[in-house]
Amino acid sequence: MSLSEEQVQHFLDQNPDFTDQYFGKTLSPEHVAGACGDGQPTDCASFRELCQVEESAALFELVQDMQESVNMERVVFKILRRLCTILRADRCSLFMYRQRNGVAELATRLFSVQPGSALEDCLVPPDSEIVFPLDIGVVGHVAQTKKMVNVQDVTECPHFSPFADELTGYETRNILATPIMNGKDVVAVIMALNKLDGPCFTSEDEDVFLKYLNFGTLNLKIYHLSYLHNCETRRGQVLLWSANKVFEELTDIERQFHKAFYTVRAYLNCDRYSVGLLDMTKEKEFFDVWPVLMGEAQPYSGPRTPDGREIVFYKVIDYILHGKEDIKVIPSPPADHWALASGLPTYVAESGFICNIMNTAADEMFTFQEGPLDDSGWVIKNVLSMPIVNKKEEIVGVATFYNRKDGKPFDEQDEVLMESLTQFLGWSVLNTDTYDKMNKLENRKDIAQDMVLYHVRCDKDEIQLILPTRERLGKEPADCEEDELGILLKEVLPGPSKFDIYEFHFSDLECTELELVKCGIQMYYELGVVRKFQIPQEVLVRFLFSVSKGYRRITYHNWRHGFNVAQTMFTLLTTGKLKSYYTDLEAFAMVTAGLCHDIDHRGTNNLYQMKSQNPLAKLHGSSILERHHLEFGKFLLSEETLNIYQNLNRRQHEHVIHLMDIAIIATDLALYFKKRTMFQKIVDESKNYEDRKSWVEYLSLETTRKEIVMAMMMTACDLSAITKPWEVQSKVALLVAAEFWEQGDLERTVLDQQPIPMMDRNKAAELPKLQVGFIDFVCTFVYKEFSRFHEEILPMFDRLQNNRKEWKALADEYEAKLKALEEEKQQQEDRTTAKKAGTEICNGGPAPKSSTCCIL
């Protein structure tokens, strides 16, 4: 039985529930698409309303996207693309809310999203953002009012701005926009443009818009809260670590900044930052004021800090994080230095404002360098600059941060984080005065060292006195081959026999200082170390000449004494046969230590340095002068043109420096008494070996024992003047005494103290007695034990004993004269007393009593 069309229509009208159920089931989009026959699914938006199943499927897909994707832009992009389809809008856009410099703004993040768009085409890169202040455009109005806006005709809307249309060439007719809120705070604004199938967006569109944006709001809230959490975490870490490093270094501002910045660099989220330190001087020097007062110069009219100081950056510290990390310190930077040339740091120092510039290329107030700053191709894109303020509210510097790592401009959270860091830096800069003083002292020290090196170093003319290459070869030593220099030196040097450098009785009294330099060079050739260790011969000559100039022209501790000690060391090693225990490298170091052991001696001892509060005493706690001599020697060796160790490998170099440390410090007589017993045990131990060869093999491998022997050798060398022939020793002793008396004069006049007898000029006649005491108390043990250790050294001990006899004879002679003078004085006193008694008798006084007779 068939029903007519009217009957079916009547049935459906009478049964609305059945009608809804039937059409909801049979007229789904899939059935309609299948009925179309072309195989293309029908767009859901072709229906005015979605069925509940399809709507649920769409919402489930959105939730699934949110769950699977952590990228906010990707999820919101899918939502906007679906909204375009459902609302039949031409396109949708996402504007992110942010604050810079305390001013709120909206910036495009997803722009012109259409149903067929790709994410890469719609995602706006940071350098292409369109930024709307809140007082411009419908999007700004929505952010201000925090309410949805449906503009049916933009020509009738007072808030509409054609700014974006003019940039893109697009024509906007109607707008549907709503804010995304996190509590009372605006996070973003989403906007749909131009209804395609109608004159404007309807109230039904608004409902659908809000329904789908609930998911977008959730996603944006998660993103916003995650960002805030990340910012607070970074801020907490910056506060923690910067505080830790700031209070770890309280004197050196560069180390403070380096430690603080280096430690927190990962939390600052920028490519580069620089800190400009301001000059805190408030009063000018007189020579700067005079031209102004005389009318010859205009008074300063440039910018000033809020407290009236002229803005002068005395130092810029530039910290580089992109590419290879580096830190650069620029003292007294020029005005055209890239960190200052834009004028932004000066403006911040003048105003005290925080400046956040999102696009430096388009900024009209400041002129930043447009091209790359260095070879890496790094270019300034956005900048955040803020003042560093101390507790007195004085601006002491400006911190400027460049290029946020993700390419976006710095926002309010970045400002808060950077400001937290600069607050700590502001407190740390309270120590700039201390740092400045330390820096100046360091600079003065460098200048002083350079001056010393200039006056001590052998110059081009002086080297010709020993290496006459101009006269013989017609060129400078640097242009000569080593063989040529070797032949020339062989002709110039005196040889080993002319001045008896192998003998213990060597005397420098007949030698000039230049001849002693030549003898010093000769000793290195005799040891065979010049060729073995590839010492450049020009360097060797310069070193010996410079060492001789490094000794001051004082009475005893001068270059002659320095050479005598080195010559005695050379003689102990060779003639005394002690070289059998040491390698060539060690002998090389020991002779060099002898040459340098008293360099730059001041003619006063360690005790005087402490009494006079000499800076050396503050620098070195013990063995004051010895450590200074060591440092001076190392200072000369650090100069490339004087470094005779330059061709040693690392291990060899460390070894010779170690031996020099021990040898030179060992010349402190205060340490001599500590090592006497140890040396005596080594000498006694040597007597237990019947075979000399076995003993040599044993001691050669005993590093500690060798060092003790070497230390005692240095003492023997330092005191060797006491073992010279009497005619030499007597003259040298007077030189030593004269230097002691000079120190005694200083103690009496400068320190207002009474010197000890040895240094008292008024007791010069007691010198022989003092010499005998010195020989008995200090010298005898050294040379007696060395003569037991090696019989080849016996001549030194014999001459010591002979010199003692001479001094003893003089001392006895002096004692006899002194005794005779005392007896004569006593007799004179007796005669005076007797004469006085006789005068009293003549004047009627009582007669003296007699033991043999009585006067009646």
From Swiss-Prot:
Active site location: H557
SUPFAM superfamilies: GAF domain-like (SSF55781), HD-domain/PDEase-like (SSF109604)
Reactions listed under catalytic activity: 3',5'-cyclic GMP + H2O = GMP + H(+)
All copies of domain PDEase, residue ranges: 481-814
Principal location: membrane
N-acetylserine PTM positions: S2
Listed EC numbers: 3.1.4.35
Disulfide bonds: none
Keywords: Acetylation, Cell projection, cGMP, Disease variant, Hydrolase, Lipoprotein, Membrane, Metal-binding, Prenylation, Repeat, Sensory transduction, Vision
UniProt keyword Chaperone present: no
Composition bias type Basic and acidic residues, residue spans: 823-833
Binding-site list for a divalent metal cation 2: D598
Cofactor(s) demanded: a divalent metal cation
Protein localization: Membrane; Cell projection, Cilium, Photoreceptor outer segment
Residues lipid-modified (S-geranylgeranyl cysteine): C853
Pfam family, one: PDEase_I
InterPro entries for this protein: GAF, GAF-like_dom_sf, HD/PDEase_dom, PDEase, PDEase_catalytic_dom, PDEase_catalytic_dom_sf, PDEase_CS
Gene Ontology CC annotations of this record: photoreceptor outer segment membrane
Membrane topology: Lipid-anchor
GAF domain mapped to chain residues: 71-220, 252-429
Residues binding a divalent metal cation 1, per UniProt: H561, H597, D598, D718
Subunit-level organization: Oligomer composed of two catalytic chains (alpha and beta), an inhibitory chain (gamma) and the delta chain.
Disease per UniProt entry: Irish setter dogs affected with rod/cone dysplasia (RCD1) contain a nonsense mutation in the gene that gives rise to a protein of 807 AA lacking 49 AA in the C-terminal.
Family stated for the protein in its record: Belongs to the cyclic nucleotide phosphodiesterase family.
Name of the protein described by the UniProt record: Rod cGMP-specific 3',5'-cyclic phosphodiesterase subunit beta
Source organism per UniProt: Canis lupus familiaris (Dog)
